[in-house]
């Protein structure tokens, strides 16, 4: 099934979830086990971290991490599909127990939610066709730059646009829409991760895409509700063992075809 159709179907799931009333969030590991399921927010429009397979089932790096978390708790995982802007609201409205969705750890987000220790990381970069000369923020002046709304690169490039008048920012609600805009020529450049299908495609003029310059390296944590220390501490312990046992490294090679970066701790 074409990826765009898969993404549209995922959007229907998101719409349905958005209409559901807030449920009673489990505050402890014991409560999750007693309830009999772990509820996790994921984004299925961000390959290789989250996407839909041929059977329309969520798969990817983040999906496997979330699945293994449920296995460690001895309960199945119920996935709630969100896009980047919906990650924090899914915790604030108590629809999910955790967010496993390339959720970069930032001080601004940590005001609203709590994070686990990092389990993965990637560089945010500016991407454009090879024929487009870009080496820094100043080269984006006069160009349309696409972003996924609510991502870490959104903040960086929005600040760059404020400091460099003439950069036009276009925001998209999911990675698939951003990707389509880049391929079709609706935008001149995009902010995104150093991964993904964009490098397998051609621009509207037949060019290959390439990374132009690095914005910053971000590290992903599992998000939980503020002050849910019982669950957060359990997740930290579990992630420690997952990394020590080589599971995270194996998942990185499976889905990203590259080893994990060195992960800081806090």
Residue ranges of predicted features:
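Extracytoplasmic small-molecule ligand-binding "clamshell" domains
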Residues: 26-102, 254
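Ligand-binding clefts/hinges and TM-proximal coupling segments of bilobed small-molecule sensing domains
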Residues: 28, 152-169, 208-211, 240-266
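Ligand-binding cleft/hinge of the Venus flytrap
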Residues: 52-54, 66-75, 153-171, 201-205, ...
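Extended ligand-binding regions for polar small-molecule ligands
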Residues: 63-72, 131, 138, 143-144, ...
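Acidic, polar ligand-binding/catalytic clefts
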Residues: 67, 71, 76-139, 208-209, ...
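Short beta-strand-to-loop elements that line the ligand-binding cleft
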Residues: 76-83, 147, 166-174
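A ligand-binding cleft/hinge motif common to bilobed small-molecule-binding domains
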Residues: 89, 102-111, 156-160, 181-216
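Periplasmic-binding protein-like
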Residues: 120-128, 198-240, 258-266
């Amino acid at each position: 099934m074409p990826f765009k159709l898969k993404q549209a179907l995922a959007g229907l799931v998101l719409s349905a979830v958005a209409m559901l009333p807030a449920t009673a969030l489990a505050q402890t590991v014991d409560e999750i086990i007693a309830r009999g399921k772990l509820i996790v927010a994921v984004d299925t429009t961000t390959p290789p971290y989250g996407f839909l397979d041929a059977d329309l089932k969520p798969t990817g790096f983040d999906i496997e991490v979330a699945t293994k978390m449920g296995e460690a708790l001895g309960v199945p995982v119920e996935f709630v599909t969100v896009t980047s802007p919906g990650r924090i609201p899914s915790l604030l409205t108590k629809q999910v127990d955790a967010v496993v969705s390339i959720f970069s750890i930032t001080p601004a987000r940590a005001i609203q939610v709590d994070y686990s220790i990092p389990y993965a990381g990637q560089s945010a970069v500016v991407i454009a066709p090879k024929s487009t000369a870009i080496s820094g923020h100043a080269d984006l002046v006069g160009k349309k730059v696409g972003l996924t709304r609510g991502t870490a690169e959104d903040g960086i490039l929005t600040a760059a646009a404020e400091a460099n008048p003439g950069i036009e920012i276009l925001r998209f609600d999911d990675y698939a829409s951003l990707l389509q805009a880049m391929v079709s020529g609706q935008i001149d450049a995009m902010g995104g991760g150093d991964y993904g299908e964009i490098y397998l495609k051609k621009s509207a003029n037949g060019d290959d895409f390439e990374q132009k310059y690095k914005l910053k390296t971000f590290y992903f944590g599992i998000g939980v509700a503020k002050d849910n220390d019982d669950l957060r501490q359990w997740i930290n312990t579990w992630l420690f063992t997952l990394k020590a046992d080589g599971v995270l490294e194996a998942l990185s090679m499976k889905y990203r075809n590259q080893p994990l970066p060195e992960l800081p701790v806090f």
